């Protein structure tokens, strides 16, 4: 059991007539316009650019797959609320807490997939290993926004300055 997932371990041979499902990500029919803003949410499931930390998000094509879904399935929303962005070094215990490289790599993958060049807002107030998720992965929420459609007001972010006030899994 981990992260709310259960696993069944088979102890004997068995046969099954179960047919695998062919589930595909949904594609939105919502389209933005001059007077309609589009907003989406996307859980990136601990995305990070460090393939040396045990998960190979770059080598396995996760950045490109996510970018393709944002462009082709979500139709490049004006604002995207992101969950579970890891810091630049993933689960490496090196004190890094910034996710600017993770977010920049995602922005570049989206642009390469035919989407806009998003700007991003990182949660720069993360303390090392203080917010739950994969140990020292320093997951956080973040936002991508299309600067051709919306803007960010400097100083409008609120900091959690007391890192002990952040929720943890422990």
Give each language-model segment a name.
Residues 7-170:
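Divalent cation-coordinating acidic motifs and surrounding scaffolds
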Residues 1-3:
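Short, charged beta-turn/beta-strand-edge "cap" motif at the junction between a beta-strand
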């Amino acid at each position: 059991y981990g992260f709310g997932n259960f696993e069944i371990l088979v102890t004997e041979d068995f046969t099954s007539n179960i047919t695998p499902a062919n589930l595909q990500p949904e594609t939105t029919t919502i389209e933005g316009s001059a007077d309609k803003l589009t907003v989406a949410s996307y859980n990136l499931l601990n995305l990070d650019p460090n393939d040396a930390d045990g998960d190979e998000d770059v080598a396995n094509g996760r950045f490109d797959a996510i970018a393709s879904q944002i462009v082709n399935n979500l139709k490049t929303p004006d604002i995207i609320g992101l969950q579970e962005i890891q810091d630049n070094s993933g689960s490496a215990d090196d004190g890094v807490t910034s996710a600017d490289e993770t977010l920049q790599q995602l922005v570049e993958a989206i642009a390469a997939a035919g989407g806009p060049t998003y700007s991003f807002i990182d949660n720069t107030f993360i303390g090392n290993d203080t917010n739950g998720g994969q140990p020292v992965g320093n997951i956080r929420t973040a936002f991508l926004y299309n600067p051709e459609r919306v803007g960010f007001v400097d100083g409008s972010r609120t900091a959690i300055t007391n890192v002990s006030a952040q929720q943890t899994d422990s």
